[in-house]
């Protein structure tokens, strides 16, 4: 009996997250101790949206060529190419780019769009980012405002930050409770 050898995949270690602020590995931009660096002029102290220098043509992160962004790169595979749309169920685009109007079945829920629950209005059949109804208050259940804007009594609310009733986390003045 001949034994088959199973090919092994070499393990690579990743250096951790890459900071979009300074470009170094090991931390994220929100944890960066260096000043923000402008994407346009590479100077510190301001963002590209606030830059007074003429806008520079940037190179694509995928291929290094100027004139297009990574999402439009002809050299790299389109990450949305295999994406399945939650609205129409077709492959090749995502819901926010969908040109289909109407309530067709499909998507990753096996053809049952009604299983999707909208966090904004509480209805089924769409996601919050596609909601046309408006926001829903988690405190009183009414549509048109969010819980931190609710005018009704907040006795039943429980703060996620301090676990005390009467307010919600956005209005909490207590320090965070460590678990």
Curated annotation (Swiss-Prot):
Entry's localization field: Nucleus
**Nucleotide-binding is among the record's keywords:** no
Sorted alphabetically, the Gene Ontology BP terms of this entry are: positive regulation of cytoplasmic translation
Pfam families named in the record? zf-CCHC (PF00098)
User: Where does the signal peptide begin and end?
Assistant: none
Positions of CCHC-type zinc fingers? 17-34, 36-53, 58-75, 83-100, 116-133, 135-152, 157-174
Disulfide-linked positions: none
Post-translational modification, as annotated: Phosphorylated.
- One GO CC annotation, please? cytoplasm
Determine if Hydrolase is one of this entry's keywords: no
Q: Name one GO molecular function term.
A: translation regulator activity
- Recite the UniProt keywords alphabetically: DNA-binding, Metal-binding, Nucleus, Phosphoprotein, Repeat, Zinc, Zinc-finger
Q: What does this protein do?
A: Acts in the sexual differentiation pathway. Is required for efficient conjugation. Double-stranded DNA-binding protein.
What family classification does the UniProt entry report for this protein? Answer: To human CNBP and to retroviral nucleic acid binding proteins (NBP).
Q: Give the protein name, as stated in the record.
A: Cellular nucleic acid-binding protein homolog
Tell me which species this is from.
Answer: Schizosaccharomyces pombe (strain 972 / ATCC 24843)
Taxonomic classification: Eukaryota, Fungi, Dikarya, Ascomycota, Taphrinomycotina
Q: Which gene encodes it?
A: byr3
């Amino acid at each position: 009996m001949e034994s088959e050898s199973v090919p092994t995949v070499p393990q690579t270690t990743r250096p951790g997250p890459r900071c979009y602020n300074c470009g170094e590995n090991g931390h994220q931009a929100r944890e960066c101790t260096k000043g923000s660096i402008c994407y346009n002029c590479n100077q510190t102290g301001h963002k590209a949206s606030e830059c007074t220098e003429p806008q520079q043509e940037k190179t694509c992160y995928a291929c290094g060529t100027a004139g297009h962004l990574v999402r439009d790169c002809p050299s790299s595979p389109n990450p949305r190419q295999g994406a399945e749309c939650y609205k129409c169920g077709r492959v090749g685009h995502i819901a926010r780019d969908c040109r289909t109007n109407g309530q067709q079945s499909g998507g990753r829920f096996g053809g049952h769009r009604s299983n999707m629950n909208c966090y904004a209005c509480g209805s089924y059949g769409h996601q919050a980012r596609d909601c046309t109804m408006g926001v829903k208050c988690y405190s009183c259940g009414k549509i048109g405002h969010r819980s931190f804007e609710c005018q009704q009594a907040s006795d039943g609310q429980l703060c996620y930050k301090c676990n005390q009733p009467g307010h919600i986390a956005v209005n909490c003045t207590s320090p965070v409770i460590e678990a």
